[in-house]
Amino acid sequence: MKRAHFATLQPRCVVCHEAPLAITSAIRERDDDILEGILGCTNDKCQREYPIVDGIPILVAAIRGWLNANALQILKRDDLSPEIESLIGDALGANSSFDTLRQHVGIYTYDHYESKESAVLALLDAALSLAGDVPGGAAVDIGCSVGRTTFDIAARFAQLTVGVDLNFAMLRVASHALREGRVSYARRRVGLAYDRSDIEVDLPARELVDFWCCDAGLLPFRDATFAVASMLNVIDCVAAPRDTLAECSRVLRDGGNVLIATPYDWAPTATPVEQWLGGHSQRSALRGASEPALQALLREMKFEIVAERDQLPWRLRLHDRSAVDYSVHVIAARRT
């Protein structure tokens, strides 16, 4: 965690929602960067502690439950040889937590850093072109995944930018790219066969970027902190889209811009059906359509839609012989 980002953003406790956080322990540092440490709530009646691991502060309210559910992500080694990692993967088998994790990380890392035609960067460019001129100020990349878009946003606006996500394994890739200028991941060839990809990455505006582990529906930032927020392929991946948009509205200043992209690929494993924006109740006036549901919710959350485009392609590589194609709705909106 960069001290400069912490000092500028002045995060608050996500449990008591009142007190600012303080750096109570810096266990391992490099220059102005805390790689391991502890943040603490300054409210005497709360005193919640939050760990910093691999340079990433974990600012989650239900920290005990989150750590228990994500222990593999936190404790997973990255120093095993490809041969031993392959043997372990074969032994654990398909659909194991280990294999699911490396599949997901590999899918997004390839698109963000190794693909010559990055779909997510194309979506970001499209969203930025729709937004037009935006006010100066800090930016937040909500649902940043492995982080490539966060660097481009920082470079575009030349402002402090923080990428937030709840997936620690993805954030670890982003943090390593930020701090070491390298990306190393298992790229799936077919089945349980993976090839280790270790590449040097030349990233813009690294000095302006940091990555934090946060719940998009309960952000640790003060009201009106940011001038720009991006939410690329996030709305249909969170437990409560309404809460996520409400938090985005809260942390954006008046006149701030939000960039949204979504294929409305609703799945009950990520979002309870009751929380979907459209995608059900086709007997209603909207006939189950998601687009007008999102547009109406944005207006409810004090956003004015500036421009939008539909049917933009987003392709994700699954393995050498398989990919999934989405058709994405992109919206640029301004907080009023």
Please state what every model-predicted region is.
Residues 179-215:
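S-adenosyl-L-methionine
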Residues 167:
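Conserved SAM/SAH-binding beta-strand->alpha-helix loop
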Residues 104-136:
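Conserved alpha-helix/loop element of class I SAM-dependent methyltransferases that forms part
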Residues 146-157:
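Conserved SAM-binding loop of SAM-dependent methyltransferases across substrates and taxa
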Residues 214-229:
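A short acidic, Gly/Pro-enriched loop at the edge of an enzyme's catalytic core
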Residues 135-145, 162, 259-288:
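Conserved class I S-adenosyl-L-methionine
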Residues 242-254:
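A short glycine-rich, Lys/Arg-flanked "PGG" loop and its adjoining helix->strand segment in the class I
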